[in-house]
Amino acid sequence: MTMPARGVARLLSGTGLAAALLLPAAVPAQAAPPSRLPAADGKKGQELPGMPSALDPDADAVSCTPASREKAKKQDWSRQRLDLDRLHQYSTGAGVTVALIDTGVVPGAAGLDGRVTAEGTAGDDCVGHGTFLAGLIAGAGDGGPRLTGVAPGAKILALRGTDERGQASAGLVTQALREATEAGADVVAVAAALPRRDTELTRAVADARRAGALVIAAATPDPPRGGTEDIPARTYWPAGEPGVLSVADMLPAGVRPDNAPATSGIDLAAPGAGVVSGGPRGDGHYLGAGASVATAYTAGAAAAVRAVRPDDSADAVARRLTATAYPADIPQLDPYAAVTTVLGDAGAAAGAERAAKPVAVRDTSAADRATERATLFVLLGTGGVLAVLWAAFALPRARARGWRPAAAGGTGSSTGGSVED
């Protein structure tokens, strides 16, 4: 698959941004440090507060994430990379329901009014992370410079997969998955990445898939609050479950962050650093980071696809998302291509294989050496043929002259004989 010219341009333009990017850390909400919005010229841009993925679990009292007083002045790099302005000419995700399992979503938050249904306590989002992700999926972008979500026509079903402080557990995620299945969600986005597999969670994922939902989950946890002595798990759950689309975060340069946990089985990469969205209180903006952000973008893309291809199965949508992604070590999400590309059987098969196994860079060094040897043999063979032809021409003439040198001053060339008097 050849990368489109516009894709090459995006990758090149993003390279200079990575050096200027400061990732927002998931620190206690009351002390969340500001982060910089990457500027188009690669310099440090506007400063916005960071959105934590969880609150400090050791704090004596719960202090919710405060409202941001800052508003983004421009469209961020991630929306430009995903080409949302162009995508929305073909699909807005209308008629599709995305279940978001995270810290909850405030239904009346800026840009989300009329788009959110919250189950149980999920309408109260103290952390703000779930509301932030909902804006990336289906936000209207009210009051911002084209800061819409990937599928602004979709509906959000907010489900709580964490406690009040944003700490996820297998039990809460399992319960939320079952509620999403009962509600008939078309797409399920799971922000949590749990280090251990859970039997009930495995069953809940299988039930959701049998009901026709496309389950999308973060391949790794979001940036931690601080250092840890724990050895990172090689597989996180439910992203590691069969049939779940596992999503990782990438920087503007198209690579994963240096501090990203190592994991296997990643299906897609999507923007996951320096991403702008709103929060549960006020109309200000934050910067978010991590695989959960990339998962939200991918869930929005899945909603956009399901809106225009309602008869496609969840597996077919997953294949389409991977088959139309930008080629890379980890295929990079392209919502516009996923919605508009016409895939044949070969393309679908390629997408299925890519979804099952991450793409590897092919080593061509052996083939290159073989080509060099073949070229050398051809050159040597050609030289031998020319030598034989020269001998067949020159030796009879030299014998006729009695092996004397050719006379000088002729009109012919020195190597081509002479005209005798």
Which residues are covered by each model-predicted region?
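Loop/turn elements at helix/coil->beta-strand transitions in domains of secreted/extracellular proteins
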Residues: 94-97, 153-155, 183-188, 210-215, ...
